[in-house]
Amino acid sequence: MPTPEQIEVAGSLARLAAIDLATAEKLAPDPEMDDRPVGFHAQQAVEKAVKVVLMLEGVDFPKTHDLEYLIVLAEKHSIAMEPELESASWLTPWAADFRYDDAPIETLDRKRAIAVANAAITWCHELLDEKQG
């Protein structure tokens, strides 16, 4: 069981994840918006949500943007997750690689990115509610 302090930190991170999701959702419909900020905020929402769950389950994790690493870490600790999240590692390059390079990039599947981020936010909030209750 996480301590009240851990729950507070997890709650703060969950709120930041929700802000990233809201930002991605706001930017995504605009066809003139470059994919980079949309992908970045979707990736950040997923990353923060996974970290919230790891934190609440007492799993230590390094400072990383690597979603595959974080997802495998959750799986190693038998943490069940939404099927959409099991393959969310495709969002990892949007955290830094594409954000700091103006070379041509792959096209972001915006609907998929938002759907994965939504699933991640729902997942972490459900666990947060359970741990708070």
Predicted regions and their residues:
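Terminal alpha-helical segments
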Residues: M1-G133
